[in-house]
Amino acid sequence: MVKTVYVTGYKSFELNIFKDDAPEIHYLKQFIKHKIEQLLDEGLEWVLIQGQMGIELWTTEVVIELQRTYDSLKFAVITPFQGHTEKWNEHNQSKYANIIKHADYVDSIFHTSYQGPFQFKQADQFMLEHSDQTLLIYDEEQEASPKFFKQMLVDFMDKTNYTCDIVTFDELTAFINDLQWSEDQSF
Protein backbone atom coordinates (compact mmCIF):
# COMPACT_ATOMS: atom_id res chain seq x y z
CA MET A 1 0.00 0.00 0.00
CA VAL A 2 1.31 3.42 -0.97
CA LYS A 3 0.55 5.99 1.72
CA THR A 4 3.20 8.53 0.71
CA VAL A 5 4.39 9.30 -2.82
CA TYR A 6 7.20 11.58 -3.88
CA VAL A 7 6.45 13.24 -7.22
CA THR A 8 9.25 14.80 -9.23
CA GLY A 9 10.52 15.24 -12.74
CA TYR A 10 11.42 17.93 -15.19
CA LYS A 11 11.62 21.60 -14.36
CA SER A 12 9.38 23.68 -16.62
CA PHE A 13 12.27 25.14 -18.65
CA GLU A 14 13.62 21.61 -19.29
CA LEU A 15 10.34 20.95 -21.11
CA ASN A 16 10.57 24.29 -22.96
CA ILE A 17 7.51 25.54 -21.07
CA PHE A 18 7.83 29.20 -20.17
CA LYS A 19 4.22 30.38 -19.79
CA ASP A 20 1.55 29.39 -17.29
CA ASP A 21 -1.04 29.05 -20.06
CA ALA A 22 1.02 26.66 -22.22
CA PRO A 23 -1.32 23.87 -23.39
CA GLU A 24 1.22 21.23 -22.36
CA ILE A 25 0.63 22.12 -18.71
CA HIS A 26 -3.05 21.18 -18.99
CA TYR A 27 -2.16 17.72 -20.28
CA LEU A 28 0.65 17.17 -17.79
CA LYS A 29 -1.65 18.12 -14.91
CA GLN A 30 -4.36 15.79 -16.21
CA PHE A 31 -1.80 13.00 -16.35
CA ILE A 32 -0.56 13.71 -12.82
CA LYS A 33 -4.17 13.83 -11.60
CA HIS A 34 -4.83 10.44 -13.19
CA LYS A 35 -1.77 8.93 -11.49
CA ILE A 36 -2.60 10.40 -8.08
CA GLU A 37 -6.23 9.27 -8.30
CA GLN A 38 -5.01 5.72 -8.95
CA LEU A 39 -2.88 5.94 -5.81
CA LEU A 40 -5.76 7.45 -3.82
CA ASP A 41 -7.80 4.35 -4.64
CA GLU A 42 -4.98 2.35 -3.02
CA GLY A 43 -4.86 4.44 0.18
CA LEU A 44 -2.59 7.38 -0.67
CA GLU A 45 -2.46 9.99 2.11
CA TRP A 46 0.55 12.24 1.39
CA VAL A 47 2.23 13.73 -1.68
CA LEU A 48 5.79 15.02 -1.19
CA ILE A 49 7.67 17.52 -3.35
CA GLN A 50 10.85 19.57 -3.01
CA GLY A 51 9.34 22.77 -4.41
CA GLN A 52 10.84 22.84 -7.90
CA MET A 53 9.18 24.72 -10.75
CA GLY A 54 7.63 22.36 -13.27
CA ILE A 55 6.35 18.87 -12.49
CA GLU A 56 6.56 19.37 -8.72
CA LEU A 57 4.61 22.63 -8.48
CA TRP A 58 2.08 21.47 -11.08
CA THR A 59 1.59 18.42 -8.87
CA THR A 60 0.71 20.60 -5.90
CA GLU A 61 -1.83 22.49 -8.01
CA VAL A 62 -3.41 19.13 -8.85
CA VAL A 63 -3.37 18.06 -5.19
CA ILE A 64 -5.04 21.31 -4.10
CA GLU A 65 -7.78 20.62 -6.65
CA LEU A 66 -8.13 16.98 -5.53
CA GLN A 67 -8.37 18.00 -1.87
CA ARG A 68 -11.87 19.33 -2.63
CA THR A 69 -12.94 15.73 -3.19
CA TYR A 70 -10.39 13.85 -1.10
CA ASP A 71 -10.22 15.84 2.13
CA SER A 72 -7.79 13.36 3.70
CA LEU A 73 -5.17 13.99 0.97
CA LYS A 74 -2.24 16.10 2.17
CA PHE A 75 0.93 17.45 0.64
CA ALA A 76 4.30 18.50 1.98
CA VAL A 77 6.91 20.80 0.51
CA ILE A 78 10.33 19.81 1.82
CA THR A 79 13.04 21.91 0.21
CA PRO A 80 16.74 21.02 0.19
CA PHE A 81 17.68 24.33 1.86
CA GLN A 82 16.06 27.58 2.95
CA GLY A 83 15.58 30.40 0.48
CA HIS A 84 15.68 28.20 -2.59
CA THR A 85 13.31 30.56 -4.45
CA GLU A 86 15.31 33.75 -3.83
CA LYS A 87 16.66 33.85 -7.40
CA TRP A 88 13.26 33.17 -8.97
CA ASN A 89 11.40 36.01 -10.67
CA GLU A 90 8.59 37.73 -8.80
CA HIS A 91 5.84 35.86 -10.66
CA ASN A 92 7.27 32.44 -9.81
CA GLN A 93 7.90 33.47 -6.20
CA SER A 94 4.26 34.52 -5.94
CA LYS A 95 3.09 31.17 -7.36
CA TYR A 96 5.32 29.36 -4.89
CA ALA A 97 4.04 31.44 -1.96
CA ASN A 98 0.48 30.49 -2.91
CA ILE A 99 1.42 26.81 -2.96
CA ILE A 100 3.06 27.11 0.45
CA LYS A 101 -0.13 28.68 1.87
CA HIS A 102 -2.01 25.51 0.95
CA ALA A 103 0.65 23.01 2.03
CA ASP A 104 -0.06 20.79 5.01
CA TYR A 105 3.61 20.67 5.94
CA VAL A 106 6.59 22.84 4.94
CA ASP A 107 10.22 22.43 6.00
CA SER A 108 13.79 22.33 4.69
CA ILE A 109 16.29 19.51 5.02
CA PHE A 110 19.03 22.05 5.75
CA HIS A 111 18.00 25.10 7.76
CA THR A 112 20.65 27.19 6.02
CA SER A 113 21.00 28.83 2.63
CA TYR A 114 22.58 27.03 -0.33
CA GLN A 115 25.97 25.55 0.54
CA GLY A 116 26.55 23.00 -2.21
CA PRO A 117 25.17 20.19 -4.39
CA PHE A 118 25.31 17.78 -1.45
CA GLN A 119 22.12 19.45 -0.19
CA PHE A 120 20.19 18.26 -3.23
CA LYS A 121 21.54 14.74 -2.82
CA GLN A 122 20.56 14.68 0.87
CA ALA A 123 17.09 15.99 0.04
CA ASP A 124 16.66 13.26 -2.59
CA GLN A 125 17.75 10.63 -0.08
CA PHE A 126 15.31 12.02 2.49
CA MET A 127 12.45 11.77 -0.01
CA LEU A 128 13.26 8.14 -0.77
CA GLU A 129 13.49 7.24 2.91
CA HIS A 130 10.21 9.00 3.78
CA SER A 131 7.97 7.82 0.95
CA ASP A 132 6.60 4.50 -0.23
CA GLN A 133 6.88 5.22 -3.93
CA THR A 134 8.24 7.77 -6.39
CA LEU A 135 6.37 9.03 -9.42
CA LEU A 136 9.18 10.26 -11.68
CA ILE A 137 8.34 11.93 -14.96
CA TYR A 138 11.57 11.47 -16.87
CA ASP A 139 12.63 10.03 -20.19
CA GLU A 140 16.24 9.10 -20.90
CA GLU A 141 15.69 10.31 -24.47
CA GLN A 142 15.68 13.86 -23.05
CA GLU A 143 18.33 13.99 -20.37
CA ALA A 144 18.01 16.73 -17.79
CA SER A 145 18.39 17.29 -14.07
CA PRO A 146 16.20 14.32 -13.01
CA LYS A 147 18.84 11.89 -14.33
CA PHE A 148 20.82 12.28 -11.09
CA PHE A 149 17.80 11.45 -8.97
CA LYS A 150 16.90 8.53 -11.24
CA GLN A 151 20.29 6.93 -10.64
CA MET A 152 19.89 7.36 -6.89
CA LEU A 153 16.37 5.90 -7.17
CA VAL A 154 17.57 2.82 -9.07
CA ASP A 155 20.35 2.24 -6.51
CA PHE A 156 17.87 2.65 -3.64
CA MET A 157 15.43 0.18 -5.22
CA ASP A 158 18.22 -2.38 -5.63
CA LYS A 159 18.81 -2.31 -1.86
CA THR A 160 15.20 -2.07 -0.63
CA ASN A 161 11.65 -3.07 -1.57
CA TYR A 162 10.92 0.49 -2.70
CA THR A 163 8.74 0.97 -5.79
CA CYS A 164 8.63 3.61 -8.45
CA ASP A 165 6.67 4.64 -11.49
CA ILE A 166 9.02 6.14 -14.06
CA VAL A 167 6.94 7.82 -16.72
CA THR A 168 8.42 8.13 -20.20
CA PHE A 169 7.35 10.40 -23.02
CA ASP A 170 5.77 7.39 -24.75
CA GLU A 171 3.43 6.85 -21.79
CA LEU A 172 2.67 10.57 -21.59
CA THR A 173 1.99 10.76 -25.32
CA ALA A 174 -0.39 7.79 -25.20
CA PHE A 175 -2.30 9.37 -22.30
CA ILE A 176 -2.48 12.76 -24.04
CA ASN A 177 -3.69 11.15 -27.29
CA ASP A 178 -6.44 9.32 -25.38
CA LEU A 179 -7.37 12.49 -23.50
CA GLN A 180 -7.50 14.56 -26.69
CA TRP A 181 -9.63 11.91 -28.36
CA SER A 182 -12.09 11.80 -25.46
CA GLU A 183 -12.21 15.62 -25.34
CA ASP A 184 -12.93 15.68 -29.09
CA GLN A 185 -15.73 13.14 -28.62
CA SER A 186 -17.41 15.27 -25.96
CA PHE A 187 -18.07 18.14 -28.38
UniProtKB/Swiss-Prot annotation:
Pfam families per the UniProt record, alphabetical: YpsA
Cystine bridges: none
SUPFAM superfamilies named among the record's database cross-references: MCP/YpsA-like (SSF102405)
Gene3D superfamilies per the UniProt record, alphabetical: 3.40.50.450
Family designation: Belongs to the UPF0398 family.
Protein name, entry field: UPF0398 protein SAB1311c
Organism field: Staphylococcus aureus (strain bovine RF122 / ET3-1)
Lineage: Bacteria, Bacillati, Bacillota, Bacilli, Bacillales
